[in-house]
């Protein structure tokens, strides 16, 4: 996108704020390099990565610590003979250690099914050989370990042994010669890999030896006694051997890094990328931002939008609801000076650029943005005295420069175009520009003070008007938008607010009256109505949110209580069944307890109803009815003349119900119920569906009995009195297993094979307690 337009929107300032949340300089540089993407898939994938990253941090509390920049290290390795020193290798192993810790923490993504984090992890191939080698050779302070090689171990052992010999000789010399008064300090030090004594300068001629150096003050000289010369020569040889061996080890470790260069660089990039993600999460917390998905061809629907650079300021900023449906391409904003028009336009452009760059934006969840591949901005005073360019000329030049580049994939921000010339001609040019934008399908947000352009916004198809509101009593801006209306410029009120002389204001008002341009009273009234409407809408939204919250809580409470009751009844039924199977209670007592447990679901009282029950003769097959006890609608599918009962289909559940519990339903409900049952009759019911009729055909006996057991639990909880079990004829083995199950179940009052016309010995009808 055009850098100049992003600069006008203050996009670089947002990147600078974002980079301040990074823990590394490399992460900060990566933030500063972010730019808008033009592919909806990439933008939405980045948004999803952010949301899943938020969930990861919320669940684990993981925080990435600081780590050093390694770009220079990788650049240094490009030359084949360069060898990394211990400090560079230590920085690398520490960074790789952090990357491994992060990698292990992110592995929770597989269990949580965070797909974008899994993709993030899959992109890293771990430099195991390099990491292991560095851990083996470097200690926790970054020094090369003695155990890095046998040769180094032996050399350092010799150095330590020689050091002990030197120390003993020096102590014996000091005490034997009684020269402690000649020394500045009673210790031995090292200069140029040689052990020396800190001798007071005025005593240097009294002892035999070599002076190697002097202190800054000149009061101390570093003196090597003659008895240490041979030992020091040996020490220098050992130190040289140590340096040679250390160089071999560093060369070896550098070779490991080179052999896994790509993996090391990828692990570092992995850490930098997560640093950027963490910065986005922290930024979102600071300004209350969310990730926004973009939809090609969608309209603008930004709820509670706030300018990100103002969102964290003291006192915050009033949120804006920015709306532009798909059938409208241009929003023209009018209203008072210093009323927030420019802030509104900047907010639209800046939030769009942020969203396209994968940066969370300060809006409410559920906000939607269309996709744009280009954003052009004309805003502010662009005059140049050096180039002899006025404000108006600069605007004209800018539009001329970008005009041929704008199409349906362009977002155009236009602030007070034509304001630097004759109002009539400026308004005409502005209308012509908007006409051209509409023809090219360009989406535009514009601000104006021109009355002609305000009228144009109200009457032109594809264009929408909006006004920034002001307080009717104080004339101060409210920084909120009212749609489908225009606003007054209230220039005189703004002048009065800023201390403009009253005498001049009075004359200005007289001139307005003389010119017939004083439409202020009408516009003020429109503003009052708009403010009132916005308050009413806010109150309605508040009440709606409160009611929805209350409803959700009640539904949640009801569901908890329902599950508790069902679980309790099921537990009671299982307890009764176990008591009966253990022989602790008889069949009749078990049946009584099951009946009592089942009655707790619906209670003893039947719901009151004004519906008059049918007589048995009034009921016809196919007739819609109302189950008075349950207040549920159904359709009659069968009648039992002997028991004076009716089989009713209620939403796919078929059950036998006494005729005196059925009544008529309203005409509209009848038609709807007949339609539903007719549709269901045309469709084959899926096998295994847990209703009051179960089909066990084709199943192994153990599987069938397990399903039948669960089916019984459901039937008892629903309060069923009749069951139909389809087991088929076949060899009769499944039927025998079903009957054995029924014989052992205390909830069964009796059972028999169905009549031939309803399945015969292929189905068993069961009567429950």
From Swiss-Prot:
One of its GO terms (biological process) is mismatch repair. The keyword NAD does not apply. This is Endonuclease MutS2. It comes from Maridesulfovibrio salexigens (strain ATCC 14822 / DSM 2638 / NCIMB 8403 / VKM B-1763). Belongs to the DNA mismatch repair MutS family. MutS2 subfamily. ATP binds at residues 335-342. The keyword Nuclease applies. InterPro entries: DNA_mismatch_repair_MutS_C, DNA_mismatch_repair_MutS_core, DNA_mismatch_repair_MutS_sf, MSSS, MutS, MutS2, P-loop_NTPase, Smr_dom. One of its GO terms (molecular function) is endonuclease activity. PROSITE patterns: DNA_MISMATCH_REPAIR_2 (PS00486), SMR (PS50828).
